[in-house]
Amino acid sequence: MDLLLTNARLVTLQSGEMGYQPSTPMSIGIKAGKIHYLGIDTALAATKQIDLKGKLVTPGLIDCHTHLVYAGNRSNEFEMRLQGVPYQEIARQGGGILSTVYGTRQASEAQLLEQTLPRLDGLLASGVTSVEIKSGYGLTLVDEIKMLRVAKSLSQHRLVKVTPTLLAAHALPPEFTGRANDYIEFICQEIIPVVAEEQLATSVDVFCESIGFDLAQTERVYACAVDHGLRVKGHTEQLSNLGGTALTARYQGLSADHIEFLDRAGVEALARSSTVATLLPGAFYFLRETQLPPIELLRQFGVPMAIASDVNPGTSPFCDLTLMMNMACTLFRLTPEEALRGVTQHAAQALGYAESRGQIKTGYDADLAIWQIEHPADLSYQVGTQRLFARVVDGQFEQHKECCDE
């Protein structure tokens, strides 16, 4: 073995009720970045051995929806909104999403990296080992590629796995004002082929909404993405029920995200597919929304529910995935087990890694979070304390610098 972790209380999150219950002290043997052994043997030959002294071990957390790479700051808009200034007026004054677009376009790759790393560090401190990162603040070929390159480069600076997603269909750039169909054609003809050829992303996302892109435009992007060998996912049913979730499910999309206005027909479409329902409680909270996602219907039809941070400067400036677990429980009434599975097992499925990440299981990637807590429910219950002891990513052990052993 390359690494042997002993005296670990495992929360494997394998299917079934026992997957959530902490085990008696066990050992985890890791070889070539994979979980090679799970059992009680503490004397296996290993290059490195660490006694965890009864600490709780879960799969590494997976943040399956973020907009982590961007430049600029929109805290002034936060103040304006709290003073009652409508979004339309904020946008007229140069704010809103286009202010982030302008800032991101002007920033170099080095500047984007410098601004992104502190946000990434926040996620890692909450136990994240895998993170999805979308483009969408460039809206030109050059700037979308710039964002994706910065996203991919993060794993060279931090111990983390990055899954880049192309979100050129995030907003209408000023150059295409009044010409949404032309912009969609530009994405399909100019951006997607280059991103696919250079392997800068594994999937393509679309903001399918009344203030974004309609169903026909979304399907045009989906069809193009699939033609280029890329998976699809969607921002759907956040502000209205357009049918974007059902469309995403029809294309066997990885996930449909937000879904506050999803109806029964949309839930049934998800149930007939492998598409995951991703809940984004941070945006719900920050925007003070009132329309709850249909949690009971999703449970009734057995649709897997992932949870993500949706880190972005406008609607979810939160860099702590355990805070999102707490919000999912308090705002959406998920159980702590559903919340933990939502940032591990189901988040892995939402990124296409259901057979390699999100569970502690032999043959799976050795991606682990090691905690100084008694029970997994503590992750959803308490926020703000230094609970993370260490992370393991592809078998590499990294102790959290803010946490000390007892």
From Swiss-Prot:
Report the subcellular localization.
Cytoplasm
Binding, N-formimidoyl-L-glutamate: Y137, N312, G314
Q: Which UniProt keywords apply?
A: Cytoplasm, Histidine metabolism, Hydrolase, Iron, Metal-binding, Zinc
Could you tell me the superkingdom of the organism this chain comes from?
Answer: Bacteria
Enzyme Commission code(s) on record: 3.5.2.7
The UniProt entry, under InterPro entries, shows: Amidohydro-rel, HutI, Metal-dep_hydrolase_composite, Metal_Hydrolase
Question: What is this enzyme's catalytic activity, as reactions?
Answer: 4-imidazolone-5-propanoate + H2O = N-formimidoyl-L-glutamate
Name the SUPFAM superfamilies for this protein: Composite domain of metallo-dependent hydrolases, Metallo-dependent hydrolases
Q: Where does Zn(2+) bind?
A: H65, H67, H235, D310
Q: Which CDD domains match?
A: Imidazolone-5PH
Q: Which GO terms describe its cellular component?
A: cytoplasm
User: How many cofactor units bind, and how?
Assistant: Binds 1 zinc or iron ion per subunit.
Q: Which cofactor does it need?
A: Zn(2+); Fe(3+)
Residues bound to Fe(3+) are H65, H67, H235, D310
Pathway noted in the entry: Amino-acid degradation; L-histidine degradation into L-glutamate; N-formimidoyl-L-glutamate from L-histidine: step 3/3
GO-annotated biological processes: L-histidine catabolic process to glutamate and formamide; L-histidine catabolic process to glutamate and formate
Q: Binding residues for 4-imidazolone-5-propanoate, per the UniProt record?
A: R74, Y137, H170, Q238, T315
Query: What functional role does this protein have?
Result: Catalyzes the hydrolytic cleavage of the carbon-nitrogen bond in imidazolone-5-propanoate to yield N-formimidoyl-L-glutamate. It is the third step in the universal histidine degradation pathway.
UniProt record similarity statement: Belongs to the metallo-dependent hydrolases superfamily. HutI family.
The name this protein goes by in its record: Imidazolonepropionase
